[in-house]
Amino acid sequence: MKRLAQLLALAAAAHAAPPESFWRALHVVETSGRHGPILGDNGRSLGPLQISRAYFTDSRVGGTYEQVVDLGFARKVVSAYLQRYAPQAWAAGDVVTLARVHNGGPAGARKAATVNYGAKVQRLCK
């Protein structure tokens, strides 16, 4: 029964999504809303949502890393990554946890270093 509940929760999470304001806030925090091949983190991140090569690989989205310069593709990558590493936050639309995982990796929601980042995204979501 517990396994069934977990499967149902995962299925629900796959169909839920954070509000549009989350995507706008993430874009603004990462690159001030700019588009294109923006390099960040000393060349380690790319595109409007500042995705690293490791993040892209972890997302398991097909295509090439260079495609993250396109905002629509970058959103697909972030969506897949967050659904993989923060499915409950995704289903609940928990923008703070989602932002912290985006910023700090799979354990980002537990890292003190991501608290301010999460708060900044949350402020912009309002």
Identify the residue ranges that each predicted region occupies:
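Hydrophobic h-region of N-terminal signal peptides that target proteins for export
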Residues: Q6-A16
